Amino acid sequence: MRLNELRDNDGATKIRTRVGRGIGSGKGKTGGRGVKGQKSRSGVAIKGFEGGQMPLHMRLPKRGFNKPNRKAWAEVNLGRLEKAIAEGKIDAKKPIDADVLIAAGLVRRALDGVRLLAKGELKSKVEITLAGASKAAIAAVEKAGGKVTLTAVADDAAE
């Protein structure tokens, strides 16, 4: 077998039908679209329209709601915090707060506050002051000999 003998398997590629190329082609003039009407025009595909039948998105019930005053937390996991300390981006001997995390590039914006989560492992002894933290994250920091201080007064800060 040589490179010039390589070819696709039979049926692997389908030849595109060229429509609107004369009546002799069998797909000329209207190009398989029928005559007149909305669907014969170009650029028409009505998303969600089912020919007058009640569309699926309207047949299904409404569910849930969006909490108007929900907090948007910026989240930091213990594993990323430990990695930043190991890389020298954060000094573990100094207190860590939202500004330190932003400067180190762990968080882009503080939003409604920074929240510490327990994914990963923390080996360094650190003193952290943040708006919120999960119970597992607080336990992990205290197990490593550190301390977590929460600044947010919100009910959902320490869940």
Swiss-Prot record:
InterPro entries: Ribosomal_uL15 (IPR030878), Ribosomal_uL15/eL18 (IPR021131), Ribosomal_uL15/eL18_sf (IPR036227), Ribosomal_uL15_bac-type (IPR005749), Ribosomal_uL15_CS (IPR001196). Residues 1-13 have a biased composition (Basic and acidic residues). SUPFAM superfamilies: Ribosomal proteins L15p and L18e. It comes from the Bacteria. The keyword RNA-binding applies. GO terms for molecular function: rRNA binding; structural constituent of ribosome. Disulfide bonds: none annotated. It holds the Pfam family Ribosomal_L27A. One of its GO terms (cellular component) is cytosolic large ribosomal subunit. PANTHER family: 50S RIBOSOMAL PROTEIN L15, LARGE RIBOSOMAL SUBUNIT PROTEIN UL15M. Residues 1-41 are annotated as: Disordered. Residues 21-35 have a biased composition (Gly residues). Belongs to the universal ribosomal protein uL15 family. Part of the 50S ribosomal subunit. One of its GO terms (biological process) is translation. The gene is rplO. NCBIfam families: rplO_bact. Binds to the 23S rRNA. This is Large ribosomal subunit protein uL15. Keywords: Ribonucleoprotein, Ribosomal protein, RNA-binding, rRNA-binding. Gene3D superfamilies: 3.100.10.10.
